[in-house]
């Protein structure tokens, strides 16, 4: 029985799921917006938000924890040098999920997951307002 078990299986075994979310978290931190299915986006929140919270207090121990979870030194650098200071005053809620229709092959519901307050989005809004 699956009573009180949190998280989605997504038809993958645990090592595949862990590797997939590690790669997706790295892509989201690197590009600040990615397109994926709604279910994967909702699960990805549970991986990325604790990483950003960890990056808000910069220490060697926290950097090692972040590296252990992402296995990508470039991503760890961006987390602690850009994203941690950017979200220093925000108490959680670092991501936004925007639904964007259905995928053309299997009609899976798709969504963009993005980091809130990313600079490119702010510039686009200002240009549209002018």
Swiss-Prot record:
Alphabetical keyword list: Ribonucleoprotein, Ribosomal protein
Record note on quaternary structure: Part of the 50S ribosomal subunit. Contacts protein L32.
Protein name: Large ribosomal subunit protein bL17
Entry annotated with the keyword Metal-binding: no
NCBIfam families: L17 (TIGR00059)
Lineage: Bacteria, Pseudomonadati, Pseudomonadota, Gammaproteobacteria, Alteromonadales
InterPro entries cross-referenced by the UniProt entry: Ribosomal_bL17 (IPR000456), Ribosomal_bL17_CS (IPR047859), Ribosomal_bL17_sf (IPR036373)
Native source organism of the sequence: Shewanella loihica (strain ATCC BAA-1088 / PV-4)
HAMAP family cross-referenced by the UniProt entry: Ribosomal_bL17 (MF_01368)
UniProt gene name: rplQ
Cited Pfam families: Ribosomal_L17 (PF01196)
């Amino acid at each position: 029985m699956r009573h009180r078990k949190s998280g989605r299986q997504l038809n993958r075994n645990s090592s595949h799921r862990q590797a997939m979310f590690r790669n997706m978290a790295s892509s989201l931190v690197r590009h600040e917006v990615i397109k994926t299915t709604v279910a994967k986006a909702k699960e990805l929140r549970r991986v990325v938000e604790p990483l950003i919270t960890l990056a808000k207090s910069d220490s060697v121990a926290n950097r090692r924890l972040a590296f252990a979870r992402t296995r990508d030194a470039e991503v760890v650098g961006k987390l602690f040098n850009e994203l941690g200071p950017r979200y220093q005053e925000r108490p959680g809620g670092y991501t936004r999920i925007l639904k964007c229709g259905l995928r053309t092959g299997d009609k899976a519901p798709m969504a963009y997951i993005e980091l809130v307050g990313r600079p490119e989005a702010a510039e686009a809004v200002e240009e549209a307002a002018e």
